[in-house]
Amino acid sequence: PNGCPRRRGRQTYTRFQTLELEKEFHFNHYLTRRRRIEIAHALCLTERQIKIWFQNRRMKLKKELRAVKEINEQARREREEQDRLKQQQEKKLEQQQQQQQQQQQQQQQQQQQQAPPQQPPQQHHTISHHLHDQHKLGLEKAPPGADLLKAVAKVPT
């Protein structure tokens, strides 16, 4: 009414138009004027409609990429937090194991201090006595695999 052209309503595109525009966008996010004219004629749309569709599609892509980036950042932060918690748990477990080892060592030291010193058992036999015992039993000349029961039977009781 006041000399300004009336704004058109929202343009709805057919499935075919949308598919063709998406295919073109897949290869080129920006169009030359010549290509815009070709697409407009092929799809029975105006150059302005093609230009606006591509602007909107670039904004949609930008928004999607921002959302993906945010999801990845959130996943990275969660992963870092999980790693940090895992390291804390491992450190705590390691400290507990060290404390247990120290306690065991202290207990062993206390037990050793409280227990009377043990002397190793004394051996009264000498090699010559051992050889004498073998001679007495007749073992020194026994062929390999000889019946040991015979030798045991000769042991004085």
From Swiss-Prot:
GO molecular function, one term: DNA-binding transcription factor activity, RNA polymerase II-specific
Main location: nucleus
CDD domains xref list: homeodomain (cd00086)
Family annotation (Gene3D superfamilies): Homeodomain-like (1.10.10.60)
DNA-binding region of this protein: 6-65
GO cellular component: nucleus
Keyword DNA-binding included in the entry's annotation: yes
Name this polypeptide is given: Homeobox protein abdominal-A homolog
Organism this protein belongs to: Schistocerca gregaria (Desert locust)
Origin organism lineage: Eukaryota, Metazoa, Ecdysozoa, Arthropoda, Hexapoda
